[in-house]
Amino acid sequence: MPHEELPSLQRPRYGSIVDDERLSAEEMDERRRQNIAYEYLCHLEEAKRWMEVCLVEELPPTTELEEGLRNGVYLAKLAKFFAPKMVSEKKIYDVEQTRYKKSGLHFRHTDNTVQWLRAMESIGLPKIFYPETTDVYDRKNIPRMIYCIHALSLYLFKLGIAPQIQDLLGKVDFTEEEISNMRKELEKYGIQMPSFSKIGGILANELSVDEAALHAAVIAINEAVEKGIAEQTVVTLRNPNAVLTLVDDNLAPEYQKELWDAKKKKEENARLKNSCISEEERDAYEELLTQAEIQGNINKVNRQAAVDHINAVIPEGDPENTLLALKKPEAQLPAVYPFAAAMYQNELFNLQKQNTMNYLAHEELLIAVEMLSAVALLNQALESNDLVSVQNQLRSPAIGLNNLDKAYVERYANTLLSVKLEVLSQGQDNLSWNEIQNCIDMVNAQIQEENDRVVAVGYINEAIDEGNPLRTLETLLLPTANISDVDPAHAQHYQDVLYHAKSQKLGDSESVSKVLWLDEIQQAVDDANVDKDRAKQWVTLVVDVNQCLEGKKSSDILSVLKSSTSNANDIIPECADKYYDALVKAKELKSERVSSDGSWLKLNLHKKYDYYYNTDSKESSWVTPESCLYKESWLTGKEIEDIIEEVTVGYIRENIWSASEELLLRFQATSSGPILREEFEARKSFLHEQEENVVKIQAFWKGYKQRKEYMHRRQTFIDNTDSIVKIQSWFRMATARKSYLSRLQYFRDHNNEIVKIQSLLRANKARDDYKTLVGSENPPLTVIRKFVYLLDQSDLDFQEELEVARLREEVVTKIRANQQLEKDLNLMDIKIGLLVKNRITLEDVISHSKKLNKKKGGEMEILNNTDNQGIKSLSKERRKTLETYQQLFYLLQTNPLYLAKLIFQMPQNKSTKFMDTVIFTLYNYASNQREEYLLLKLFKTALEEEIKSKVDQVQDIVTGNPTVIKMVVSFNRGARGQNTLRQLLAPVVKEIIDDKSLIINTNPVEVYKAWVNQLETQTGEASKLPYDVTTEQALTYPEVKNKLEASIENLRRVTDKVLNSIISSLDLLPYGLRYIAKVLKNSIHEKFPDATEDELLKIVGNLLYYRYMNPAIVAPDGFDIIDMTAGGQINSDQRRNLGSVAKVLQHAASNKLFEGENEHLSSMNNYLSETYQEFRKYFKEACNVPEPEEKFNMDKYTDLVTVSKPVIYISIEEIISTHSLLLEHQDAIAPEKNDLLSELLGSLGEVPTVESFLGEGAVDPNDPNKANTLSQLSKTEISLVLTSKYDIEDGEAIDSRSLMIKTKKLIIDVIRNQPGNTLTEILETPATAQQEVDHATDMVSRAMIDSRTPEEMKHSQSMIEDAQLPLEQKKRKIQRNLRTLEQTGHVSSENKYQDILNEIAKDIRNQRIYRKLRKAELAKLQQTLNALNKKAAFYEEQINYYDTYIKTCLDNLKRKNTRRSIKLDGKGEPKGAKRAKPVKYTAAKLHEKGVLLDIDDLQTNQFKNVTFDIIATEDVGIFDVRSKFLGVEMEKVQLNIQDLLQMQYEGVAVMKMFDKVKVNVNLLIYLLNKKFYGK
């Protein structure tokens, strides 16, 4: 290592800033910076050493580590170590760092860091520790990354995945130069050093269920460890609040010792650290063991105990016990498989024997079990003949095979299949690792041999092309070619035959390859060898026969011919003399014709090759010899064969009849036939007469022979019993093997068909089971067990739940932000309008503009910083208050009657604000199915209440402005219904606006005036027509009529388009709006049963069209139906066109005809009637919707079975406001004392203030702007996890529904691990040890999942405790619960508790529906969020537009010196500027000007005694007004010109000053402008 550890703990290199020596402030600061640099170097060294242990790889030196980690390669390798399923080596970019070393960082290196972050997310490390990608890649905050690595090490230690990181502070030494360089680096980037010592505490808080309970439990454990009593320590470890798993009472002494050592070591390190850390920076967990450290040490002890147990059971030789020991989760070993138990036992036993200590350490077991499990899976795949699985297992790095080339995996698999069959036939079950490795090596050798052979084939083809026989022979004799039977003496003939074969292949147009392959070369060599043998045979025949003839050895001719001819059977011995005579005669004739004779014989083979043989020298050749003279006196082979054949044929023909001489004699003897027939008949008659005796004789004889033969056979068997048994066993084995291989081959040949059949059968079985689950009234337990896994909450479920919660929060926040932004923009619009009237208010406009641009921030920080005193602090009192508020809002949310009554108790203006803020917030703006369902229930209850109490006649709904209807329309036209309105109306509205030629004006007077103006424009002369006319007069002009008719035609055409868009888009209408329309129709009909359907449908139309759609058509820009740019607007013609269409549709929806002043439009009345009929069908169909319970699949028990608890995001101001209103109207909405609401309000007490809600200290008491700060903080939003106080109680007071839920969860846990046909059978049958182990493993897996589960999704504490029970205890608890439920009538033992099984089946079905609805909700929320973002972007564009306008005003103002300059800091004119003089008026003068109207209790003639001094203050637009009576100053008030302008805008004409002086607001503003601004 680059830095040596010091022998013992000592102070850091640069000591503490509180050393005894006297240091100046600068020296102390320098010392502190040096200490920070040293500590950080120690943390770097700690991270480096820990990563080296995990990666088994050396990292760069400590001082270079930061730079070495920037490319993310080591981080990605670390991710592969703890999350191998997430990160593989192939996914790591530049894994060998060759590119990085060559050309430095590349942007793709960030992929490595991203993979590391995702891997940490997958194992559940809290995100509070994560660095940003740029922190690493751009080196913006490397200490943050090192901080994260430390947190990760502690978290992995808790999970038992990695060792604990070392504490090296004060144990390593760095040079002064290294420390100074690091200090400069830290100062260069200005990085705030994270607090490494607080990682344990932060991690504990982030992962806890209840921070306070966890903290207390951890402290109790530390205290118990300090006392040293092992039994007491185990009791504290068992505390459920500590959230510790796998605590074994039998290991109490080991836990005590390990935790004692760890705690003492941590305390020792803490003492060193605290010497250089200020008191404020110290953390409680610096000396205490954190929950993660405790769990890590428990895991460490458990692991060692499990390893000891494994080593103890291996020598016993029981595979089942060994398997159980290996499967224990405490052993932290890879998965093992029961079918390979014998293999684990044998292999581990052998490994243990090979070990010198006869003991296998955990690391050895880890590697061995991983490899053996991989081998087991490979054997399983081989047995199932699954080639794909075999190949996947071979590719697995866990199996650890050497020299495995992934390119040949398929070949390895096929070979292993063959070897597997062979070992199976020999009675061996599994292939061992060594056998698999040997098979891999064998295949590699074969592949290498084949590759070498391919090279040799290439050499042979090249030699053939060269035409050199010796070169060809040399290549044929290469060992790698493996060509057999090559005779070097016939090299030339090999060359000729090979060349000929290759020429033929070249000439074959269908041949793909133009070279000879190995089998073709071997065939050519074999053909050449056949030619060679034939030639030798021919030479032997010719030489032997001719030499025999020349030697006149007639007696040898037969032996010569038989030994020399190809078929000796054709030689007939009787013809020997004839053969000799014929051959001698032929040779003599041939010799007479020869004058000179040579010594060479020639043979032509296949009419292609010539073979030469010298009879004298015995040499042979495949090429023509030099000076070749043929031996023409000798008979050739063909001549000899022809002579032999001729002699043989003649002999056969000559003797054909002699062979049948005896037969001919017999035929001659048949002349005595009659005599023979008489003898035959006599014999036959005798036998017939003696038939009975003959039969007996024959039977006796046959029996005798059969018995004799049987006894002889039997004796043979007895004498050879051993041999017979062997023969029989081998025969049976061969038969069975043949049958098995035949069947196996059949399966291989029909693999695809078999897979399809199996898939079909499985699918049919699964389909039938699911139909049974869904359709059967009493689904059997066996079916339920198959689908119970669907109730598990996967990581995907949690991710989707978190995503839904995040989107809900974002949607709610965005809606509120947009609403506030819209209000501020409207106010800004007003202020700019007022600015035009009075320039002095520009400062206020600028101030409001800054408010628009100011981003919200700081509130949550203040809230979080007051955790010790605020509503979310850890004190018991605050916790109780928070829980009570959560229960209060849950009650309000789920019981709509309270809010329905409260709405009608408040004044109209106050209830509207309450609805727009608190109610919609309480229901999260219906951002999910549950809250939409509950909000609709509120709307329904409130609407029914309003109709019941406030509607006296049917038309009141139309003519009035019902509160609930207004609320429903406002909600559905907001964020949730905005997309609907856009989809429904945007296309046709945009078409109308974009049609520049479209002019719709149905006002005859306006049409007339436009026509007159057009005439004057065209002629340039004043028209003689009157300008002011009535409607009747205007209609007398044909031109006006024509234009009016054209407008009416355009109106009808355009209205049709809008109507069709509305009618065809019924499904786009929000379900909530349609349901309220249905409730409205039914409620009106219930109160007014005599109302006709037309009246009811008109009321529905008033809601759906007039209130919901009509405003959006008239003002599409105001309802965000179309996109408008800032500064852009709809012109008057476009707005008139839209208004005309809306007017026609409004008349049609209410079936109102054009009459009276609209008589000129009466031609459209038929059109209105037809349109009404279409609207009537539309309104009727719109009310045809299911009830919310059916639509959303909700009931009153839904909250008890859903995964996540409901969460709302509400401001402190809204909580206080709601609390206040509930107390104010408590007597009206909850008159009973024992009402649930009254009980909760009683628990809360008085309404808290904002400051008490946040906690004392949230705001500085001396802050002059304390009121404004508190007002701003009151808008801080907090999240409330809603819970019901009355759903689940502790102990025995649990209600039957909650008991049913708990019992179902316990039953699900039991039936997973214990088989059985009925619930009763399972509960009465004891669980086996294996089932207990499987159950414990499942519960550990669930605990790990629960540890990553967000707070709002966790189960109750009682359910967590139940889940930790062993299998048998769970069964006993189920039996107790079932007896309780049977007493309440929920279940019955007579049907074996089928009722609770039916409930579980229902939960399974509902879970699928819930997942489907959740996906739909995700899409819906995303769509809503996109629309809100677009709207926010539009508002931002308006803000920019206003900013530009204000900037222009400022620029203009600077150029005008005649007016008073305005300072943006609010201080008025610069120093030295002349201030306006005070203005003094008597009351009589002001009364004369009309400014002053009256003074209470003072007569007009006394006005002269009253004077008013108006003085401009330092602040722009602020005036002091002093009143004097008879020269004595009475009172003083302050006037704000902005307030006056606001009152003027709101239409307030008269205001009071001094509570008694009435003044005219408009004239007062005029006076101030004139006197102070020169206006």
Swiss-Prot record:
UniProtKB keywords: Calmodulin-binding, Phosphoprotein, Repeat
Ranges where the IQ domain occurs: 690-719, 720-749, 750-779
Gene3D superfamilies: 1.20.5.190, Calponin-like domain, GTPase Activation - p120gap, domain 1
Keyword Repeat applies: yes
Superkingdom as given in the UniProt entry: Eukaryota
Signal peptide (UniProt feature, chain positions): none
Alphabetical GO biological process terms: Arp2/3 complex-mediated actin nucleation; mitotic actomyosin contractile ring assembly actin filament organization; regulation of actin cytoskeleton organization; signal transduction; thrombin-activated receptor signaling pathway
Sequence ranges assigned to domain Calponin-homology (CH) in this UniProt record: 41-156
InterPro entries cross-referenced by the UniProt entry: CH_dom (IPR001715), CH_dom_sf (IPR036872), IQ_motif_EF-hand-BS (IPR000048), RasGAP_C (IPR000593), RasGAP_CS (IPR023152), RasGAP_dom (IPR001936), Rho_GTPase_activation_prot (IPR008936), WW_dom (IPR001202)
Tissue spec. comment: Isoform 2 expression is enhanced in testis.
Modified residues (Phosphoserine): S16, S595, S599, S685, S1271, S1279, S1358, S1461
SMART domains, sorted: CH, IQ, RasGAP
Domain Ras-GAP: 933-1182
Primary role: Binds to activated CDC42 and RAC1 but does not seem to stimulate their GTPase activity. Associates with calmodulin.
Name this polypeptide is given: Ras GTPase-activating-like protein IQGAP2
Organism: Homo sapiens
